Amino acid sequence: MNLTLKIWRQKDSSSKGQMVDYKVTEISEHMSFLEMIDVLNEGLVAKGEEPVAFDHDCREGICGMCSMYINGEAHGPDRGITTCQLHMRMFNDGDTITIEPFRAAAFPVIKDLIVDRTAFERIQHAGGYISVNTSGNTQDANAIPIAKEAADTAMDAATCIGCGACVATCKNSSAMLFVGAKVSQYALLPQGQVEAADRVKNMVAQMDLEGFGNCTNTGACEVECPKGISLDNIARMNRELMKASV
């Protein structure tokens, strides 16, 4: 198939960016979206032009780095996948595809389609962990019985890969689905309940400090989340915060 690509190009975080049109030809419907961009970049390099910078690593929907806003949707028109899992069969010959970086004040553009998402890392560092005594008397990890329902729900929350689609698709650039998932995966487990109060207060405080917007319960984040993280996690985070604040 032959396609027109409208891609955001920006030299660095301090430069102004613009949309630039490119043509790609003979693209196989079996290619992944990133493979299609690889083809574009090979052509640009062959002509002595600067290739389009984009983030990627695993290309298996695990790392969350390949975050792109494609035709007005985080990760593109398919559901339950990341950009690297999107295939060109979702598009038609002759289509025009608009490709942008994730847009949020807390995700400044580094170059082209790459944004700085270290705000998520700082939120995680604020409390997204369980402290373990490693003095030599550490208890075996499997010694504490956990109800299957709690384990399953915690695992559902833990599937969050921190890609930032929830922020990009939210009209308020809210990170509450991400933070809610990270709070929930520990709050549901007995190992995580010891530090539950400090965890939720510290993570929410860091989220606010990073400049993310507030949640107004639109629900777009859940729809476009590649892992289908439920809004239930936001409700659980709010309950945990209320308990920690009284």
Describe these PLM feature segments.
Residues M1-Y22:
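Eukaryote-biased recognition of intrinsically disordered, low-complexity regulatory segments
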Residues W8, T25, I70-G72:
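Short strand-turn-strand beta-turns centered on an Asx-Gly dipeptide
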Residues V20-S32:
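Short, contiguous acidic and Ser/Thr-rich linear segments
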Residues M31-E50, I97-V246:
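Ferredoxin-type iron-sulfur electron-transfer modules in oxidoreductases and energy-metabolism complexes
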Residues A53-M65:
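Short, structured protein-protein interaction patches enriched in aromatics and acidic/basic residues
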Residues I62, M68-I70, C221:
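Functionalized membrane-embedded alpha-helices
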Residues I70-G94, I99:
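Glycine-rich phosphate/adenylate-binding loop and adjacent beta-alpha elements
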